[in-house]
Amino acid sequence: HITVNLVRLRPQMNIRQVVTKYGYSIVSKEVANNVWLARRGNKYRMMRLRGEMLDKDGNKSIWNCDNWAFLLDAPFLVSSECCHIMKKRAAHTYERESREKPIVAMMAEEGRQRFQTWTATGCNAFEGKRPMSKPMSFWTEQDVLQFIVDRELPIASVYGDIVASDGENDYNATLIDCKLHCTGCQRTGCMFCAFGAHLEKGENRFERMKHTHPKHYEFCIGGGEWDADGLWKPNEKGLGYGRVLDFIGVRY
């Protein structure tokens, strides 16, 4: 039995209010933020989406994301604001009020921006404007899974079992030296977030939600309506993600 000293934080806006005001979380934080800012006249972000950014050698920049330029014409809002409003803002408020500093489990391999931050600050950034510790920065997903297997640690049922795979078949994680993965969800996070959903192979998060949490699925995929400006937004029946996922080719 494990006792947890937990303080539950609640955001000032709910998910429907956030999506209505700021837009849907699709593709990635980086791409969604580019679309949000480019639509508001940011020339730098527009150049990224058009594939016009060049590096110091005159070659196309790695920050270009022109394959997602079609989202500029999407009939709905797109942004990365949801994470900031529903998670980060609440955490920042708690930090100020409690005067406590965060220890987070972000890993550098999870994204280009996280890797750059780690190379610049290391695992502990105590001198910055927002001091924090990130002790798992140099860990990889395989490190985490192997740690769990070696120590026989319990994990949430939503992840299924940890198994080893040779690319064709799954084996008991302790019987073969191959890459590890979970038979259920590979990652968990906000239920109504579509960041990275286009990369999922096999049954994706929304298809899984359909049979594990049917009421949540209906709220997420169903609902939605056109507003006076011709933009698709949530309504009292649901978030309307179905039309959005259709637009980017993600199954549900």
Task: Please give the residue ranges for each predicted region.
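ATP-dependent adenylation/nucleotidyltransferase module used to activate substrates
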Residues: 1-143
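ATP/NTP-dependent adenylation/nucleotidyl-transfer catalytic domains that generate, transfer
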Residues: 128-129, 140-252
